[in-house]
Amino acid sequence: VETAGVDELDLKARIGEVLSRWPVAGLAVGVVRHGSLAWFHGHGVADIAAGTPIDQDTVFRIASVTKTITAIAVMQLQEQGLVDLDTPASAYLNAYRLIPARPGFRPATLRHLLTHTAGVRAVREPSDLLRPALGWGTRAGRPVPSLAGYYRGGLHIDAEPGTKWAYSNHGFATLGQIVEDVSGVPFGRYLRERVFGPLGMDHSDLVRSGRVRTRLATGYVLRSRGLKAVTDREVVPAGGGSVYSTTGDMARYAAALLGGGANEHGRVLGPATLAAMFEPSYQPDPRIPGMGLGFFRGQAGAHPTVSHDGIWPGFHSALVLAPDQGTGVVAFANTGPFSPLAAAGPVASAVLRSILGLPGDAVRTGVPEQPRAWGELCGWYTLGPGVLTDPQPRMLGGVQVSVRHDHLTIRGQIPVPAVRRGLRLYPDGDDPYAFRINLPGFGSGTSSVVFSRDPNGHVTAMHLGVQPLSFQKRPGAQNPGPWAAGALAASAVALAAGHRHRARRAVAIKGGRT
């Protein structure tokens, strides 16, 4: 590992600050620069009982970072002329059907699936909300059903494609199935032969094979009495989150993403194709970075970033790249609830900012406020009525913008005290309709919040930057509607486990190694 130009003291201090809020059994962090792993930091253990230390070859479940790899596979088919991103996905999907809620819906395309705008529901059926891991997993050791069996009744399209952003594991599972149906090669084998193999990722796989099994970390959640191992499950919608990998292998992957599709071992995509994946393919508003093809777009200081996080019970992962600087960070933790509230994402962001010479992510406090616009901004904003396409954001019930203590604030109907009390909207420049909120307690640093207007100048919507969600303003509404209470009650149950980790019982874990 080449550590030249890396300020280890600053990196470890920033990591330590995150871990003081999000304790873990084990954490692995890799910094990629100049096409290789420039710095590695291992903290804690892969398995508490065995005392196995974290190292570069510890295997983690990378969860939804898998989606970026699935997107690479789709774009390989596009380069070969085997698929067209704007052709209906059903033209390539043989294993099961996509079923629109209304016959007049436009067809869902591969581009829609790659940007979470296909209208695919987050759960196969409402009863999945009551199942472990939302019905996405099956106990380890049991047969994993084929997607044809898993979606035997078809996969439902609940919103018209192209009209709404809603994060969907099932959409990326469908992309993986399309890769299999078009190539004629099982998806796991396809990734081994055409992505992992060319990039030298010898300790990565879609399934729990001999390539990954012996070095696999144990996943934990933090309970009031300490760390507890999670129930081990396999991911059924594999293209959405099933890959196992190591810090070393994911550093090789990041090097290829920063190297125009190639690293020192080989090439998986052409530079122009990869560049197109990083460009905006969905933006609810031009001020929101939005989505590329399989990647979230963002900003670190003046530097554009592309990234993806992953969440699975007991595991959290993050990949964040600053392509203009040829720099990337991968981070993996084997501790965390099935919610975004955990260490890997904040660690990756903090490390990248350190490498780029940036201070910690914070709102700008010296920007003058513009109260003249507050009156038209205040009110209730909702995701709107209709089918529950994505239960996680819909748990907000409604979002209220109001003036509290002489500041503009945003308040959500969700059982998180800070959000229910209200988060201050800090002005983010001269634009009176652009703000930032401070989210350090949620592992997200800051997030942009912008308001859009119709041609007549009336405020019609609010858009979030942390995920490209849009909330529509409800003129004259005094509350989010009677369904908000139900959403709030449902979210209280669903989020309860995700907040148990906030207990700050000390956990004895050995220190880090470089």
Protein language model annotation of sequence segments:
Residues 2, 506-514:
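Intrinsically disordered, highly charged
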Residues 93, 114-118, 199, 257, ...:
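Hydrophobic aliphatic residues
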Residues 38-40, 96-105, 118-126, 188, ...:
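Secretory-pathway/luminal and periplasmic proteins that interact with or process carbohydrate-rich
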Residues 106-109, 171, 242, 246-249:
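An acidic site on a long C-lobe helix of protein kinase domains
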Residues 70-71, 171-176, 251:
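Well-ordered alpha-helical segments within folded domains of soluble proteins
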Residues 494-506:
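Short hydrophobic alpha-helical membrane-entry/anchor segments
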Residues 9, 21, 33-36, 45-169, ...:
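Active-site-proximal loop and beta-strand segments within enzyme catalytic domains
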Residues 2-41, 134, 180-185, 189-193, ...:
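Catalytic loop of the DD-peptidase/beta-lactamase superfamily, centered on the K-T-G motif
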